[in-house]
Amino acid sequence: APKPEQPAPAPKPEQPAPAPKPEQPAPAPKPEQPAPAPKPEQPAKPEKPAEEPTQPEKPATPKTGWKQENGMWYFYNTDGSMAIGWLQNNGSWYYLNANGAMATGWVKDGDTWYYLEASGAMKASQWFKVSDKWYYVNSNGAMATGWLQYNGSWYYLNANGDMATGWLQYNGSWYYLNANGDMATGWAKVNGSWYYLNANGAMATGWAKVNGSWYYLNANGSMATGWVKDGDTWYYLEASGAMKASQWFKVSDKWYYVNGLGALAVNTTVDGYKVNANGEWV
């Protein structure tokens, strides 16, 4: 009998696909390390007190003496207060304005002017020059005005204190101050003319006798030369200004005679010579 066919082998079940492996979970994030707590700063070491550490700090010493603040100088008294007004320090005088700042240059206190140097020290008993003008301050520092006698000479300081030069009219008289400011006396030549200043400095006009000779000064003070009429009388002044007297002399080819007083002889006879109304020998 036929052999029964071998049944086909039962199919092997497929191997089931391997179960998917679960993915590895992402590692849990590590907690951030907390920032390290800041270390407390080391406290600054206390400076060693000058004295024993147990003593409290001494209060600040008050300012005394000169202090420069914002470019200005101030002076503080020993009690710490700021000085104002006049201050004597190390032999010099200083002036502190109302705000305490040290003054320099001209300062008016009351009716008087004073001058403080760049250092602040007051000038005294001296001549000094400011902006090409000369000034004088006395021993108290006060600016001089009017007449000033200095080292035997006289000077005149105008109302604003500057030294006068040239002609000065004062109380009705004229005076001449030389270029260096000293008052002229005696003969002075100014702009080509001669003038005579009396011993007190006043300019002479009219007749003046100097060293035994007579001179005539015009109304403007200038010395006359040549013919001069004073009143009704004529006189003759030489080129030097000296008046001729008791002599015959010749001018422009004419002869004239003047007597002992210098007066020109007219309409008369002198030494047998006749002179006419003009004084000319005829």
Where are these regions (language model features)?
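Extracellular adhesion/carbohydrate-binding repeat motifs centered on closely spaced tryptophans
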Residues: A1-V282
